[in-house]
Amino acid sequence: MPMLNIGPDARSGGMANVGVGLSPDANAIFWNPAKLAFVGKGTTYGGLSYTPWLRRLVPDVELMFANVAAGVGERGGIGASLRYFSLGEITFRNEQGEEQGTYRPYEMSLDVAYALQLSDHFSGGVSLRYALSDLAQGQVVGGQLTKVGQTVATDVSMFYQGDEFSMQDGQRGQWVGGLTLSNIGAKIRYSESGAADFIPTNLRGGAGFNWTLDKYNRVSILTDVNKLLVPTQPTRDLLDADNDGDRTEIIAGKDDNVGVIAGIIQSWDPSAKPDGFKELMREFMVNVGTEYWYNEQFAVRAGYQHEDVTKGNRRFFTMGFGIRYNLIGLDFAYLFPADQTVRSPLENTIRFSALVDLNQIMK
């Protein structure tokens, strides 16, 4: 379920999906649930996000995200979100090429989260997730009747927000950082006898610096590093080079048909990867982003994501902007590829988000 790792909101989207150390808002439940502890006592935010996905390839794939975050007591915070990923209209055919009907496969997840300040600067958070994937809509594939895939998972995270300190000319600075271990959960299965697939367990760590120039101008510079915690697929002797009749023989790496915890451990083992330590290093994805605020009302954002060419080659720049006025906030993000010689299905991706201060509405 790659959908579980797609950044849903336009604020982080405008910063190349940097989010683990970004200042807390309603979208914290996705990037770092621990940030919910710092949304503020008596504060309640609601958010909606919409992303047309892979528009260069298909016209009707889209990701929708609804969320809410609230401060609880002096040091707590809670959040909830619903994510819905529509794969558009697909015509199914049998092995003879005959149409079996037109359907709209989809995936969704429902999250709840709680966070607590452990000190004035540190917080911890945990979220629980129910995820559903209905890809084949009960069709017979490879002689097997498919079913809806379901799983449950959890995220565990921490967040650090330092004291502001004085700099020259009246400027102020603040260090921030965080760590999120997400999608720790059972494998997902689409048929009774078929193989179970890993969900995208992910480790995301990040740090940043908030620089307040004066009462009107503030700049944040942040970076995230991501690594999938699932075992790397081994290289198999598919061509039967040794003529022993076994085309499933592993000739480099280790068997990836292991349990969830064993898979997390194996994801760090260089000997389990066909290209050893070099491949382990290639599995880290780096995101860098910056955000400028004027008078806490208008924001401009930019970012860059780098992924190794052998691990997806998702390299792109992003830009975005945001507006806050009274109880409403609006954000927009746009993605364009870093390599203009290689066309990417993600190019020209846009994201829209709206944020509402629910406390102000209820007054």
Task: Please place each PLM-identified region on the residue numbering.
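Subset of outer-membrane beta-barrel
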Residues: M1-K363
